[in-house]
């Protein structure tokens, strides 16, 4: 091998995302709050997408303010742009129009998609309302496909590479007892296999598709759920080998790895589980 092969830039992967546009769905949520800051710190422009425009706009302002306070003087490159968009990812036409508008607004084609949008709800299987089941599958399942499809089309048309990161769940591969979440479990199992299917189809276009499957995360929503329910938190943590729940920041490294073309150029169709060892037991 020649000296170029052994050069620093060739051997040591960069996690910089300078000049790249990242679409982050579920953009006003707890996981997106920390992910968006990390993406901005790595040089990316970030488009936050969520149902509630007002909350998403506030999230965008918060990220930019954080960037101005935390990044000033640390990097030569200017702070990237952060935009906010309202979209129901369960509506294919709305997703397509929104993603086109994002690319036009930023003057570039997005090359990274992080889909954190989705939700869970508890119903005993025999009592699960059909409408609720349909709505959950439309957002978690079809929504994951719609955003992937709208993201990939311009990349394929322009012969560009890209990375799709779909948020799965450990509930996509195991039954997370005792929560009665059969439809959520099914939706996340579908997301994991969707990523594998798209990875195989789009490998010829150099579009990588992976899932990141978290365990229990201490998002603001989760903190509210367990507030005043010490026994619930204790039960959850007893099933985790690391004996604690995860902070949202503990998923940032995994997302940056999957987003980075130099770090994960040969990783596609993979389900990266970050659960503190929960699935080992």
From Swiss-Prot:
The keyword Oxidoreductase applies. It catalyses: D-arabinitol + NAD(+) = D-ribulose + NADH + H(+). PROSITE patterns: ADH_SHORT. The active site is at 169 (proton donor), 184 (proton acceptor), 188 (lowers pka of active site tyr). One of its GO terms (molecular function) is D-arabinitol 2-dehydrogenase activity. Its EC number is 1.1.1.250. One of its GO terms (biological process) is arabitol metabolic process. Signal peptide: none annotated. Keywords: NADP, Oxidoreductase. The keyword Oxidoreductase applies. Pfam families: adh_short_C2 (PF13561). InterPro entries: NAD(P)-bd_dom_sf (IPR036291), Sc_DH/Rdtase_CS (IPR020904), SDR_fam (IPR002347). NADP(+) binds at residues 31, 52, 184, 188, 217, 219. Pathway: Carbohydrate metabolism; D-arabinitol metabolism. PANTHER family: BENZIL REDUCTASE (PTHR43008), DEHYDROGENASE ARBD, PUTATIVE-RELATED (PTHR43008:SF14). Belongs to the short-chain dehydrogenases/reductases (SDR) family. This is D-arabinitol 2-dehydrogenase [ribulose-forming]. It comes from Candida albicans (strain WO-1).
């Amino acid at each position: 091998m020649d000296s170029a092969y052994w050069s620093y830039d060739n051997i040591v992967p960069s996690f910089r995302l300078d000049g790249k546009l990242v679409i982050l769905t579920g953009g006003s949520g707890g996981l997106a709050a920390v992910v968006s800051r990390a993406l901005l710190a790595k040089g990316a422009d970030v488009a936050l997408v969520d149902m509630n425009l007002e909350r998403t706009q506030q999230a965008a302002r918060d990220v930019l303010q954080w960037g101005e306070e935390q990044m000033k003087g640390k990097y030569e490159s200017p702070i990237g742009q952060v935009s906010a968009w309202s979209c129901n990812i369960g509506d294919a036409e709305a997703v397509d129009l929104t993603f086109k508008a994002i690319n036009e607004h930023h003057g570039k084609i997005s090359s990274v998609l992080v889909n954190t949008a989705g939700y869970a709800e508890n119903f005993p299987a025999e009592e699960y309302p059909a409408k609720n089941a349909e709505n959950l599958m439309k957002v978690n399942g079809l929504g994951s496909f719609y955003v992937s499809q709208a993201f990939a089309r311009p990349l394929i048309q322009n012969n560009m590479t890209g990375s799709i990161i779909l948020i799965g769940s450990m509930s996509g591969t195991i039954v997370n007892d005792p929560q009665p979440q059969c439809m959520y479990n099914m939706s996340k199992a579908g997301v994991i296999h969707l990523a594998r299917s798209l990875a195989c189809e789009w490998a010829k276009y150099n579009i990588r598709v992976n899932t990141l499957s978290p365990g229990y995360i201490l998002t603001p929503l989760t903190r509210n759920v367990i507030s005043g329910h010490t026994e619930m938190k204790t039960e959850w943590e007893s099933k985790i080998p690391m004996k604690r729940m995860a902070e949202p920041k503990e998923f940032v490294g995994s997302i940056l790895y999957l987003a980075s073309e130099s770090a994960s150029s040969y990783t596609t169709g993979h389900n990266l589980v970050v659960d503190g060892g929960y699935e080992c037991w």
